[in-house]
């Protein structure tokens, strides 16, 4: 029986084989590089956006509840809120302020240009009270007053980025041919929906968009000292009694953050799954390379076996070699993926998309490298197993 090779000898053989065919090795790992690059950049940006949204939601305050007329995000509401539901919520013990209104999208005109923005309308004093600690701060001008009619507050992006000429406080914009004077401009919030927005008084908004007496969002603040979870459950009971079903969502800031994060998480996993196809292509490339390498080195295998190397030693040499190919591809892909994520973050921030952030952690780095190594090992295992079983006498004869 032969003597087993040392671990460092196995690693040396594997490295030597890779170095001897550098060009072939580089071509082999391209698929792994592309797959890891795509996965790292997408995971980094996906979790970066989730973390940003979670932080922003938590800034809303631990005493705020958001109520939406649908059970799941992205599903059209089967019915809308009315004054009946508003009254039912106001009567719930522990409720302090109830702010209600409508959000949607519309076209606005300024200086002959037309652009699409998101719009919100609500009672101005209630809006200020509910969102006073949530980053909705005035950069220039003032907030809307309850008696303002054809006046508006616009988002940072609407004022500074959308039009060729910046909108100033006092300028006039048009919505559905109605003129509105800009009385205030919000500070930059970091997401396009809020930054590219316009806020109107509820009295004007209802008539302008034809939604009188109907509302697609309600925000509630809970009195100090009250249990927000208990108040949330009481609101659910009141709405169920009013609606007759449970086709609505009552979410605290933490629940809202978790819900949005879970939706984004599913999207991230799907996109990463698509990117993983490149890794599969890379794995096939490594497998083919190892198969060709074994055919080319039949005599080397025969010599090693004749010198006493065991079948497990030959298997280990080729498995380690394929594992290192996967690892090298993973390292290159990881570095390029991080750089790509950082570049996208910088460009997004320059364009005003502050929610786009690159999230890099040691868990991601170590996980990607281990995964890449395992992909290489698995890809090379079956060709290596067939090579390890070769008969040394036949290989030395060149058969």
Curated annotation (Swiss-Prot):
Subcellular location: Cell membrane
Keywords attached to this entry: Cell membrane, Membrane, Transmembrane, Transmembrane helix, Transport
GO terms of molecular function: transmembrane transporter activity
Keyword Flavoprotein among UniProt keywords: no
Primary localization: membrane
InterPro entries: ABC3_permease_C, MacB_PCD, Macrolide_Exporter_MacB
Cellular component annotations (GO), alphabetically ordered: plasma membrane
Record-annotated membrane-spanning stretches: 26-46, 266-286, 301-321, 324-344, 358-378
Membrane topology: Multi-pass membrane protein
Family: Belongs to the ABC-4 integral membrane protein family.
Protein name, as recorded: Uncharacterized ABC transporter permease MJ1507
The organism of origin for this protein: Methanocaldococcus jannaschii (strain ATCC 43067 / DSM 2661 / JAL-1 / JCM 10045 / NBRC 100440) (Methanococcus jannaschii)
């Amino acid at each position: 029986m032969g003597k087993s090779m040392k671990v460092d000898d196995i690693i040396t053989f594997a490295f030597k084989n890779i170095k001897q065919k550098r060009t072939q090795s580089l071509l082999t790992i391209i698929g792994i590089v592309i797959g890891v690059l795509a996965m790292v950049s997408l995971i980094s940006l996906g979790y970066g956006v989730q973390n940003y949204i979670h932080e922003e939601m938590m800034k809303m305050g631990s005493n705020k509840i958001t109520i939406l007329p649908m059970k799941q995000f992205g599903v059209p509401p089967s019915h809308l809120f009315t004054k009946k539901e508003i009254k039912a919520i106001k009567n719930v013990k522990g409720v302090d302020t109830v702010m209600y209104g409508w959000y949607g999208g519309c076209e606005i005109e300024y200086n002959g240009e037309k652009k699409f923005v998101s719009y919100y309308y609500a009672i101005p004093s209630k809006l200020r009270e509910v969102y006073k600690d949530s980053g909705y701060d005035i950069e220039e001008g003032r907030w809307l007053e309850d008696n303002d009619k054809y006046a508006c507050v616009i988002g940072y992006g609407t004022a500074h980025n959308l039009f060729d000429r910046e909108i100033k406080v006092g300028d006039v914009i048009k919505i559905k041919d109605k003129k509105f004077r800009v009385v205030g401009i919000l500070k930059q919030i970091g997401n396009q929906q809020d930054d590219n927005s316009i806020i109107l008084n509820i009295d004007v908004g209802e008539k302008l968009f034809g939604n009188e007496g109907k509302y697609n969002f309600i925000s509630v603040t809970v009195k100090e000292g009250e249990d927000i979870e208990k108040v949330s459950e009481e609101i659910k009971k009141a709405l169920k009694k009013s609606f007759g079903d449970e086709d609505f969502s009552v979410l605290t800031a933490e629940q809202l953050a978790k819900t949005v994060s879970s939706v984004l998480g599913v999207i991230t996993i799907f996109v990463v799954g698509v990117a993983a196809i490149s890794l599969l292509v890379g794995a096939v490339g490594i497998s083919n390379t190892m198969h060709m390498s074994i055919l080319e080195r039949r005599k080397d295998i025969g010599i090693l076996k004749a010198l006493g190397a065991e079948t497990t030693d030959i298997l280990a040499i080729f498995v380690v070699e394929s594992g290192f190919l996967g690892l090298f591809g993973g390292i290159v892909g990881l570095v390029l993926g991080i750089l790509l994520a950082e570049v996208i973050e910088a460009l997004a921030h320059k364009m005003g998309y502050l929610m786009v952030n690159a999230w890099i952690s040691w868990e991601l780095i170590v996980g990607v490298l281990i995964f890449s190594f395992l992909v290489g090992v698995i890809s090379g295992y079956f060709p290596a197993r067939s090579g390890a079983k070769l008969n040394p006498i036949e290989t030395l004869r060149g058969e």
